[in-house]
């Protein structure tokens, strides 16, 4: 088996990368690229040159959904933030959304799902989605468990997510396992 390849499978990324580096690696017209942030600078390095890789692998696919925030305090309020990673750079138009399931484990019911809106990341392989929730807001209760399910990304209000190279419509469907891998956030009082 090769260490890398030209296919739309996430497994085609260079094998020696750490899990974090795999999330920051994407296909480009030049090959597999690793994006790192060093201080205030964002650096990109071509790890494996494979001319035309981004067009050869087809449409962009979701490879991971991860929480940026790892906790949420209902009494203080704050911003829920998550990143959706693609296997190649995508361009966003409009305001797509990301749905978060609230298991309503806290007292009461009827909270959620929560809808995070697109905040940043167009022309990269990582899109950030956010939702501000005020202090003591009824949207969450202590002990609620927030998670991602299958097909959490949606094209709200005519928004689009397309391949930056090639322009094909990026996949917005994802298996439940991708959301499950992100883990959960348990709301504290």
Task: List each model region and its residues.
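Non-catalytic beta-sheet/beta-sandwich ligand-binding modules that flank or precede catalytic cores
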Residues: 1-189
